[in-house]
């Protein structure tokens, strides 16, 4: 058994406390290096068998043993980890930590290798593989023999995650130092991959599960709990008799496959089928048992805190608790969480840069659960029942309440024409698409295409407008794309004078999908000799970029035009055009066009203004030639195309993302809104591709909230002051650099108190570091953020005061408080203001000393100040019970005493 003097021994006997971490690493190394699948399987099975054998010897006479293979499994499949919080560490941060902890010269060869791990060096083919590069840097500096056990590694990783959550960087470094000083270079290579959550084993998690136990994958699908899988299925000879959906246990939802419009009748077995609108919200499952509710996202993350655990809290549960039929004790419902606008009586779409995941009580929009399936009713499990029967049961579960809980409307059909009519109607309504479902289908967790199909306009050739864009920039790839350009920055041309060629190009989007590795390689060869490093300090004058900058650029005359297909054009300040494309994909290289024949700004504006930016501008008509035709209102004819599913949309299915890297391994995000070319769902898909996890509402494990465009929900999240709210630009930079980019003030929309305190010590309010050198380009960027606002918002004043420790100033003693003064005869009727009372003076004092005084008693108020008249206090307390955040009711003495002493007095002694 390996020893580690710096760590406390485990109080309980476990296999993990006896197994050297080196044994696990050597097994992983053998699995990765061998080529054949049987060999890989054998190495893992041998390790697993030895673990189980030792387990039997260790616990032979014990009962109710909870020790299992979980400590090893969570390291082998780190992307499925749910218990441990985010590490907050990716490649670049690891590189900086290694440079610091190993005392490497910052400009030295090894430090440069670590920091620029994605840049090809011409030596080994390790470009983009940080763990391999780190291995060769660490090899001469690391101990020859490791001293850690599997259990100790997990304890140190727990410490890193916990200290990252507590924003304690010092303790994070301390734990990392213990890992470094007690691990060999080989062990650290695998530690890095575990932290980044991309082991690159060349074997799928499905294979790992199947070797562990025949029922493992199925149990994980209905529980999303790796520890439960390892504990319940420790004995490979014991089978689960009933692996099924359980109340209050998150399951992976059933998914839809892409439909072939031409074959839809055959795919539905030439029988009657259902057509539903495909909702553009967040997939959510609701579990209810009496007054207890739980909500889970499609990835098994818990959003109960946001939507409500009981009838008295959350943005949804209080409004729907009473709509359930009296005989319903418990149930599990599957559906889509949407944002509903009661004024227009419409649902918000993701393209509107709105995200339901973080919405709380809101004056403009409200949470609405659109239910399309029921999986349990009064302890009766229904997954094995047909969809038609489940629909009948669903109709008797609750009474729909407009804007709060709906049953998704369906209609029966049996012909292709009815499907096409429904799709055309969805196009006209600017909806995402339609669903087609087999009435006889049963519910199969995590299965795709088992009777459920989806059709979106972008899946059908001929229905979307394509854009001919010029490649002007590139980004180095990582992993299998290491050493080549894997993503491209595309641009449109400034409209030239007649018969002139364009000279200036504006960036519009970054694209990284739609092509095979061979196509990417061929394109790379074509452009290879023309790439030049992009210098942020001295960018090319003919390529204008927004905040999204390429790593390399190419002169327009040496580049090629690519045909891009996308869902829609959306606003974005990341690109020079102030807009970008949602779900862009390269269809083909336009070999028939010269570089100067790309789309112009005028053409872009025409597309952008039409159909609210949607690029699905045509109706689908099936005639004898099966060709799509233009809508009648269109006047410019297009070339007719054969109808079918575009090939590039078959592989990258956004609703079933395949992991391509471990950049965000163990990092939990809450994406509220998208930006530019990246919609909310695209950002979530990219996060999933990078190994991260996405929740619909933030919780204690959420690393940060990603925001592209601010809205009412974002403001409510900021008002809660619990989470770090970060611009989507930061996420895009992470994607661009293939690592977790350290936060800078420019990325932050709102900071939690801990983060704000950290930033106040290192940056000024415009993002200029107190200690790091600043170049001209960075300084210009800082200056661009200095706004000449005549009136500074109170929250910004409060942030500045806190950041620079000005909050001890006597003029800001009430800063950060939103206060309602009780000088209105009727609550929430400003026209009934009572004049000539002392409270009018108190209100002036509150404003003078930094408070925000409001005329309405609503969500967000922190204090209510009462004078001599207490007649309205009872009504205020009744209102307070309905609020998510409770306000304090204090006497006016709290104001006068605080002003007198120059500090905010504790409200306790002034409460009413």
From Swiss-Prot:
Its EC number is 6.5.1.1. PROSITE patterns: BRCT (PS50172), DNA_LIGASE_A1 (PS00697), DNA_LIGASE_A2 (PS00333), DNA_LIGASE_A3 (PS50160). Gene3D superfamilies: 6.10.250.520, BRCT domain (3.40.50.10190), DNA ligase, ATP-dependent, N-terminal domain (1.10.3260.10), DNA ligase/mRNA capping enzyme (3.30.470.30), Nucleic acid-binding proteins (2.40.50.140). ATP binds at residues 276-279, 283, 336, 350, 372, 432, 437, 454, 456. GO terms for biological process: cell division; DNA biosynthetic process; double-strand break repair via nonhomologous end joining; immunoglobulin V(D)J recombination; nucleotide-excision repair, DNA gap filling. The keyword Iron does not apply. The keyword ATP-binding applies. It comes from the Eukaryota. Keywords: ATP-binding, Cell cycle, Cell division, DNA damage, DNA recombination, DNA repair, Ligase, Magnesium, Metal-binding, Nucleotide-binding, Nucleus, Repeat. Mg(2+) 1 binds at residue 336. GO terms for molecular function: ATP binding; DNA binding; DNA ligase (ATP) activity; metal ion binding. Its main location: nucleus. One of its GO terms (cellular component) is nucleoplasm. The active site is at residue 278. It is found in: Nucleus. InterPro entries: Adenylation_DNA_ligase_IV, BRCT_dom, BRCT_dom_sf, DNA_ligase_ATP-dep, DNA_ligase_ATP-dep_C, DNA_ligase_ATP-dep_cent, DNA_ligase_ATP-dep_CS, DNA_ligase_ATP-dep_N. Its cofactor is Mg(2+). It is an enzyme of class 6 (ligase). CDD domains: Adenylation_DNA_ligase_IV (cd07903), BRCT_DNA_ligase_IV_rpt1 (cd17722), BRCT_DNA_ligase_IV_rpt2 (cd17717), OBF_DNA_ligase_IV (cd07968). Residues 659-748, 809-912 form the BRCT domain. Residues 615-625 are annotated as: Required for catalytic activity. DNA ligase involved in DNA non-homologous end joining (NHEJ); required for double-strand break (DSB) repair and V(D)J recombination. Catalyzes the NHEJ ligation step of the broken DNA during DSB repair by resealing the DNA breaks after the gap filling is completed. Joins single-strand breaks in a double-stranded polydeoxynucleotide in an ATP-dependent reaction. LIG4 is mechanistically flexible: it can ligate nicks as well as compatible DNA overhangs alone, while in the presence of XRCC4, it can ligate ends with 2-nucleotides (nt) microhomology and 1-nt gaps. Interacts with XRCC4; the LIG4-XRCC4 subcomplex has a 1:2 stoichiometry. Component of the core long-range non-homologous end joining (NHEJ) complex (also named DNA-PK complex) composed of PRKDC, LIG4, XRCC4, XRCC6/Ku70, XRCC5/Ku86 and NHEJ1/XLF. Additional component of the NHEJ complex includes PAXX. Following autophosphorylation, PRKDC dissociates from DNA, leading to formation of the short-range NHEJ complex, composed of LIG4, XRCC4, XRCC6/Ku70, XRCC5/Ku86 and NHEJ1/XLF. Belongs to the ATP-dependent DNA ligase family. This is DNA ligase 4.
């Amino acid at each position: 058994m390996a020893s580690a003097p710096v760590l406390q021994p485990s109080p309980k006997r476990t296999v993990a406390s006896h197994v050297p971490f080196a044994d696990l690493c050597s097994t992983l190394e053998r699995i990765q290096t061998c080529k054949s699948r049987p060999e890989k399987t054998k190495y893992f099975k041998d390790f697993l068998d030895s673990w189980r054998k030792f387990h039997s010897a260790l616990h032979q006479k014990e009962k109710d043993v909870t020790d299992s293979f979980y400590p090893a499994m969570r390291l082998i499949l780190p992307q499925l980890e749910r218990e441990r919080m985010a590490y907050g560490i990716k490649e670049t941060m690891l590189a900086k930590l290694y440079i610091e902890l190993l005392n490497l010269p910052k400009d030295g060869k090894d430090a440069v290798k670590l920091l620029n791990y994605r840049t090809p060096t011409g030596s080994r083919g390790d470009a983009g593989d940080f763990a391999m590069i780190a291995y060769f840097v660490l090899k001469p500096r690391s101990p020859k023999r490791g001293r850690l056990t599997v259990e100790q590694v997990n304890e140190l990783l727990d410490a890193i995650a916990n200290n990252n959550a507590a924003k304690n960087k010092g303790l994070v470094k301390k734990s990392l130092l213990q890992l470094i000083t007690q691990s060999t270079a080989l062990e650290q290579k695998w530690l890095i991959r575990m932290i980044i959550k991309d082991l690159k084993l060349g074997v799928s998690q499905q294979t790992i599960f199947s070797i562990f136990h025949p029922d493992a994958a199925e149990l994980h699908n209905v529980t999303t709990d790796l520890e439960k899988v390892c504990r319940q299925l420790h004995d490979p000879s014991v089978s689960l008799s009933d692996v099924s959906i359980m109340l209050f246990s998150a399951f992976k939802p059933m998914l839809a496959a892409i439909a072939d419009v031409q074959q839809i009748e055959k795919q539905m077995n030439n029988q009657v089928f259902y057509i539903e609108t495909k909702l553009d919200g967040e997939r959510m499952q609701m579990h209810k048992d009496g007054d207890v509710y739980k909500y889970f996202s499609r990835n098994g993350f818990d959003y109960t805190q946001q939507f409500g655990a009981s009838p008295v809290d959350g943005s949804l549960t209080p409004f729907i608790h009473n709509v359930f039929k009296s005989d319903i004790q418990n149930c599990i419902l599957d559906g889509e969480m949407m944002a509903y606008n009661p004024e227009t009586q419409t649902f918000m779409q993701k393209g509107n840069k709105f995200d339901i995941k973080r919405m709380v009580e809101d004056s403009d929009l409200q949470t609405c659960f659109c239910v399309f399936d029921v999986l349990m009713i009064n302890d009766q499990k229904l997954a094995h029942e047909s969809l038609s029967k489940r629909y009948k049961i669903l109709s008797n579960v609750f009474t729909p309440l407009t804007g709060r809980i709906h049953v998704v409307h369906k209609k029966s059909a049996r012909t292709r024409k009815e499907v096409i009519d429904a799709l055309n109607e969805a196009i006209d309504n600017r909806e995402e698409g339609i669903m087609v479902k087999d009435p006889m289908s049963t519910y199969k967790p995590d299965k795709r295409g088992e009777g459920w199909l989806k059709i979106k306009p972008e899946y059908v050739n001929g229905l979307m407008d394509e854009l001919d864009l010029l490649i002007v920039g590139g980004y180095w790839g990582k992993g299998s794309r290491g050493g080549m350009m894997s993503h491209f920055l595309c641009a449109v041309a400034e409209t030239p004078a007649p018969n002139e060629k364009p000279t200036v190009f504006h960036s519009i989007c970054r694209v990284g999908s739609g092509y095979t590795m061979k196509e990417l390689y061929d394109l790379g060869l074509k452009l290879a000799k023309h790439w030049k490093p992009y210098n942020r300090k001295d960018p090319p004058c003919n390529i204008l970029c927004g905040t999204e900058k390429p790593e390399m650029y190419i002169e327009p005359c040496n580049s090629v035009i690519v045909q891009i297909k996308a869902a829609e054009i959306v606003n974005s300040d990341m690109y020079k055009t102030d807009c970008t494309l949602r779900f862009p994909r390269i269809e083909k290289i336009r070999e028939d066009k010269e570089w100067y024949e790309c789309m112009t700004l005028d053409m872009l504006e025409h597309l952008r203004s039409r159909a609210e930016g949607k690029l699905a501008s045509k109706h689908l008509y099936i005639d004898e030639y099966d060709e799509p035709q233009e809508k009648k209102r269109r006047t410019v004819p297009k070339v007719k195309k054969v109808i079918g599913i575009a090939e590039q949309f078959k592989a990258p299915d956004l609703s079933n993302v395949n992991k391509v890297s471990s950049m965000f391994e163990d990092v939990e995000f809450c994406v509220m809104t998208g930006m530019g070319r990246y919609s909310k769902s695209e950002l979530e898909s990219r996060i999933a591709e990078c190994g991260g996890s996405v929740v619909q509402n933030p919780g204690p494990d959420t690393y940060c909230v990603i925001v592209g465009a601010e809205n009412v929900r974002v403001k409510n999240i900021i008002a809660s002051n619990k989470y770090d709210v970060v611009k989507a630009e930061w996420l895009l930079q992470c994607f661009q650099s293939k690592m977790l980019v350290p936060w800078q003030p420019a990325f932050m929309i709102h900071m939690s108190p801990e983060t704000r305190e950290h930033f106040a010590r290192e940056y000024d309010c415009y993002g200029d570091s107190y200690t790091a050198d600043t170049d001209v380009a960075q300084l210009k960027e800082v200056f661009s953020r200095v706004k000449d606002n005549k009136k500074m918002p109170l929250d910004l004043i409060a942030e500045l005061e806190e950041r620079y420790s000005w909050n001890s100033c006597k003029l800001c003693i009430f800063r950060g408080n939103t206060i309602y003064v009780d000088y209105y005869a009727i609550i929430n009727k400003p026209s009934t203001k009572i004049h000539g009372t002392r409270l009018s003076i108190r209100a002036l004092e509150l404003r003078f000393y930094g408070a925000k005084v409001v005329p309405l008693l609503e969500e967000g108020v922190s204090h209510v100040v009462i004078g001599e008249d207490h007649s309205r206090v009872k009504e205020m307390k009744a209102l307070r019970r309905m609020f998510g955040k409770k306000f304090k009711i204090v006497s006016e003495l709290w104001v006068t005493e605080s002003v007198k002493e120059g500090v905010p007095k504790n409200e306790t002694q002034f409460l009413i």
